[in-house]
Structures are given as C-alpha cells and as structure tokens.
Amino acid sequence: MKELTLKYGCNPNQKPSKIFMEEGQLPLEVLNGRPGYINFLDALNAWQLVKELQDATGWPAAASFKHVSPAGAAIGLPLTDTLKKIYFVDDFDEPLSPIACAYARARGADRMCSYGDFVALSTTCDLQTALLLKREVSDGVIAPSYTPEALAVLREKRKGTYNVIQIDPTYVPAPIEHKQVFGITFEQGRNEVHLTDDALFADVPTRNKTFTPEAKRDLIIALITLKYTQSNSVCYVKDGQAIGIGAGQQSRIHCTRLAGSKADTWWLRQCPKVMNLPFKEGIRRADRDNTIDVYIRDDHDDVLRDGVWQQFFTEKPAILTREEKRDWIAQNTNVALGSDAFFPFGDNIERAHKSSVQYIAQAGGSIRDDNVIETCDKYDIAMAFTHVRLFHH
C-alpha cells in the first residue's frame, strides 16, 4: 500500500488528508480502527523514540505520546511494589513482562497528560500489555507485532474502534526529509545523531565527574526522549523512566520548572499519605488521577472542602502540607536531567536541585556556562557537556 486516506487533517475542516510514500510501500499496516492525522504523527514519532531506546539500552521500551510529544517514556525494568500500586498494576498475579513494565512506567509517570494518549512499544505486544492498555483511556498503539491473544483483546477495546498499527521494524527512512509550510518546502538531513557513545560524557566541567552506569543510562534515556520532544524541552529521569517532561516552552527555565513540577508530583504520589488516601469504592481511574493531582497541589481545597470531598473519599483526608511535601521530595535521590540545548543561566540548576537532580547532560555553549558550572559545584552535581543540540519541530 502506497497511501492511506485519512478522515481529515489536524482539524475536521482540513480535507482531503492522507499519508503516502512517493517511492515504495508504506512500512505499516492498520490492524484495527481508523487512525487520524495526529494519531499518525504521534505514532511515528513515538515509534522512533522506543526503537532508539531499545537499541541504546538493550531493554524493551514504551512511550506515551500526546500532541507529538511524549508524556512518558521508559524501559522495561521490573516494578517495585510501590510503583505497581501508583500505576494501578498491582492486581496481576504473575510478574509483568519487560514490555508490560515499560508500558506501565511510560503510562504511569504522568497519568494526567497520558489520558487519551497514543502508545508505542519497541517489541511484540503481549497479552499482559494488551490487558493494561485495555483499561486505560487511549487512542491507539503502534508496535512491530502483536500476539494473537493481545490483538484479540485490543480489537475489543473502545467498542471495536481502537487504533492498532503494526510497523515494519526493519524500515529505514530516506536520509533526507521534507515538509511544507505555507506552500514552501523545507529540506534537511534526518537527525541521525547517536546518543549512546561515551563521548557524550567526555567533557565534564564540574568538580564532581562521577557518573554511575545507572546515571549514564538514565541520561541517555533523557536525551533520546528529548530528541523526539517539541522544543524547548527538558526531561527528568529516574530508574529507567522519564518522570517529568517539559515540552514546547519558549523559555528554558519554564521547561525546567514544568518538568520539575511533574517529577515532584510523580515522587509525591509515592508518599504514604497519598498512597493511603481513603478513596470510595468504584471511583473511576480518571477521577482518582485528577483528585490525587489536585490533592498534591496547593489548591487542595478544591477536593477537600466540605460538600466536595464526600464525592471521592470515605472520610476527609488531612492536608498534605508544604513542609511535608518539601521533606518528602528531599528524600528522592539520583535523579538525572537532560536538556535539548544549553542552560543559559544557573537558575535552571537551582530549580533542578529542588527536585533532587544529581546528574545533568546538556549541550553547553552558553556565554554563562561559568555560572551554570558554579551552581552545579555548589550542589555537587555532575554535569556533562554533550555538545549535541536536540531541537525537534
């Protein structure tokens, strides 16, 4: 098949719409549903990300995409009991497969932003992963293959309309890519930079020059994630998964703040006071996610005031105070941070430190590099200048 007609483009008024190949066949097949224009943008960006993550780490990988940026990305490291609980996957009797773990991590890191996502899997979608996908609100999934049992489950999702795409994992695109804006064609070489080389960590200007193997792995995950995130972007990673992604901000510090806030929320969800919230039986996942998100923030009264808390809880929870939140966040350790371009000022490092960042990889090259290095040294943070910019538009 050389082309696939779509219902419409970005918006319903943008017709006609299609995806096509000028030469050869499309390297994908729609196994179920009718994916749209934005679905394919998400699917193809997400597929590149997870394929590159698996190639770089040797682990199956998954990503959760919304509006052409990842809400989450992860490799399939085993889940702790705490993560199983906050990701709502603690009801499986058998240990989760690596690809199911990767999906649970990618989907669970930022559940608010992953609502209605498009998912990418780097390897075969098995039955466990399909069962996890089935119970989440999602637009579709792309993977190189599906077990028959998994495909049967996914074909039942969303009254049979769930989008399932199979992609040829051996497909390699042309080295030159094109796009049109306002009738004008842009051409550039594909971004083929490889983010696995030890050269990424060869230039370490900070006093602390120690990167553990786990830190290097997490920084590589951060950089690969940023390679497929709308710029400007910053990514916090811990234990093989993105825990906070700040995408599409015009200011670097706003990226760092946004991603840091998401990372803090991820960590606060593991606080015993949050994990033991007395939710009513039968509350929907989306309502639980929204309620936890508000409870953690300073506007917690939106779910705790009289006449409201009764909708969600069996008894009124105590407030999670600012002091409790600060103390809990301080217990986080060994967070890695990547940036798609240089940090212009040390304020980014100050904000990163508040979210327990210990390792940083960024391009370097700011006229204020000295200020950034000095701020890292102030907190004994190890920072590498990669000399690689990762803008994505």
Regions found by a protein language model. Name each.
Residues 22-34, 109-115, 188-209, 286-308, ...:
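Gly-rich Lys/Arg/Thr-decorated short loops/hinges at beta-loop-alpha junctions or inter-strand turns
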Residues 117, 121-122, 135-165, 170-172, ...:
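C-terminal binding/interaction regions
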Residues 71-112, 243-342:
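Glycine- and Gly-Pro-enriched alpha-helical subdomains that act as flexible
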Residues 1-197, 215-233:
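Active-site loops and adjacent core secondary-structure elements that bind or stabilize anionic groups
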Residues 69, 125, 238-241, 343, ...:
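Active-site-proximal loop/turn and secondary-structure-junction residues that shape catalytic pockets
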Residues 56-64, 164-167, 231-238, 268-279, ...:
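Flexible, glycine/charged-enriched surface loops at secondary-structure junctions
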Residues 124, 203-214, 343:
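Bateman/CBS regulatory modules and CBS-like beta-alpha motifs in cytosolic regions of diverse proteins
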Residues 52, 228, 265-269, 354:
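Conserved helix-loop functional segments at active or binding sites
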